[in-house]
Design a protein with these regions (language model features):
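Structured alpha-helical segments in the cores of large, soluble enzyme domains
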Residues: 110, 114-117, 141-145, 209-215
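Generic hydrophobic alpha-helical scaffold/packing signal
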Residues: 132, 145, 158-161, 174, ...
């Protein structure tokens, strides 16, 4: 799913670049051959969200596939750097609207690609489902932004529906996992992994060996497995799948 989201973001970047270099084909120029300022704003916002979605989804895909470490990656001043990049994108969007410069356009793309990486790397693997849902929302808003540039009503409607539903789902998932929705958007809650269970530290811990689990499974007539936050923290989804396959065979 994360890989598909990356393609949506990349497509938004390509469409925005095509509209910028051949505006006449998209009907977004005035009688003097200049691109409408409103189209430049829509283009810059769409390409920024698309680029963030692309690199963010790639990082999420690599973490979920185990190709890179799922542990949060943080460094000093990370949030200040993210804030600086965000403010820089706003300033560049204003400059791009006034000057319509190719250099500024690709600078927006470059900074957005970097911001997409920085937003996702501090998030732990256990919280990736929320990240994927949020990236789904980003891809929807990227599509909607390009829809405004192309004056495509269908793209605007579908993109808005995907963006809104993804944001709502992310909020619900954050509430269920005792996470801050704002922290998800800002990409800074991965280092807090495990804090959601601190209030339950006084409860009795039930331990068991693999032999105990095997004995219970072998004598059970039916088994219901409910994946939860603990499975995500332990990154046990692959082992759970293997166990389910073996249970079905026997």
């Amino acid at each position: 799913v994360a890989a598909f989201h990356s393609l949506v973001g990349l497509a938004a970047v390509f469409v925005a670049a095509s509209a910028f270099y051949t505006p006449g084909s998209y009907g977004i120029v005035d009688e003097n051959g200049m691109i409408y300022p409103s189209s430049l704003v829509e283009m810059s916002i769409g390409v920024a969200i698309g680029a963030i979605t692309f690199t963010g989804s790639i990082i999420a895909f690599l973490k979920l596939q185990g190709l890179v470490s799922g542990a949060p990656t943080t460094f000093f001043g990370q949030h200040f750097l993210n804030l600086f990049l965000f403010i820089s994108l706003i300033v560049l969007t204003v400059m791009f609207t006034l000057e319509s410069s190719k250099d500024i356009f690709w600078l927006i793309v470059s900074l957005s690609l970097l911001l997409g990486i920085l937003l996702i790397i501090p998030i732990g693997g256990a919280d990736m489902p929320v990240v994927v849902s949020m990236l789904n929302s980003y891809s929807g808003w990227a599509a909607a932004g390009i829809g405004f540039t192309l004056s495509n009503h269908l793209l605007i409607i579908v993109g808005s529906l995907v963006g809104a539903s993804g944001a709502i789902l992310s909020y619900i998932m954050c509430k269920g996992m005792n996470r801050s929705f704002i922290s998800v958007i800002l990409g800074g809650f991965g280092v807090e992994e495990g804090t959601s269970v601190e209030k339950d530290k006084n409860k009795t811990v039930k331990t068991g060996s693999p032999e105990d689990a095997a004995f219970i499974m072998s004598n059970a007539s039916s088994v219901i497995i409910v994946p939860g936050y603990g499975m995500a923290v332990a990154q046990a989804q692959h082992a759970l799948r293997e166990m389910c396959d073996k249970i079905k065979k026997n």
